[in-house]
Amino acid sequence: MRIFRYLEDSRTYLGVLLEDGTAYRLNAPDLMTLVGEARKAGASTADYVQSLLSELVSIHAAPESLALLTPVDAPEVWAAGVTYQKSREARNYEATAGKLDASTFYDKVYDAERPELFMKSTSARTVGPGEQVGLRSDSTWQVPEAELGLVLDRTGAIIGYTAGNDMSCRDIEGENPLYLPQAKIWRNSCSIGPYVRLAETLADPYDLTISCRIYRDGVKVVDESGSTGQLKRRLEELAGFLKRDNELFDGTVLLTGTCLVPPNQFTLASGDRIEIEIASIGTLVNTAAYAHELEQA
């Protein structure tokens, strides 16, 4: 069972997509309100929605044809780093200028008890399906990072799963680790969507194929895939560290790291179409653009 948000006649609605492909408009204004209603009814969110189906209005169009928004208006998006061997290798390549001739702090954090966690985005900087993701004007090595996102409540409990794009500047991050915020956070540097798969309806979050495809002028230039089965850490472990002595907000999203990285010689260009697909969740599609192009959009 997947939850989505969409815009129709200047109004925002919440919808649900069932396994048989049928979709319905929900009466709750947003995901976290829906979760709260289910808890008051003493039911899981999925069971609560199931009990409402006979009262709901059907959506006859395919959700992908609607004006989809971020499935949850996340007040904050956090991210975990170096949680996959592939990510570790990519960070080491950047930190050693491609020489791979020394152990780095990325090796240490990969094996450390404490994971790398950092602030990635805010609601205003996060975009949804079909929107443009931003490119920095001062970077020459930019890539998308396809990641499984955890949708959390204020206690750190996992409400559901979404697809996320952690846009990154490999040259800025590799130049100096203290530049990480600049390598990760700027206008439209994060996208999530198109759905939130309710946690209770996903059998095994460690058995999801993640794919990233990039098209330039209609030609596929990147096609990479990996699996959450390669994740070094447990999802609850990452959420647990995030909530430790921290205030979480309902609808916070935690991106859990990337298991795939485009080839080292690749960098995004304006107009590139990015498709991030996670099995059982959906395909998040965005187009890359520079800031001055975003202002014209």
Segments from the language model and where they lie:
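Short acidic-glycine loop/turn motifs at beta-strand connectors
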Residues: 7-10, 17-22, 152-156, 215-219, ...
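Catalytic-pocket segment enriched in acidic/His residues
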Residues: 9, 170-297
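A generic structural motif
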Residues: 30, 165, 227-228
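Short, acidic/polar N-cap/turn motifs at the starts of alpha helices
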Residues: 1-3, 12-13, 147, 209-211, ...
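Generic N-terminal segment detector
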Residues: 1-86, 95, 103, 237, ...
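Glycine-centered flexibility motif
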Residues: 7, 12-15, 42, 130, ...
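Active-site microenvironments in enzyme catalytic cores
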Residues: 47-216
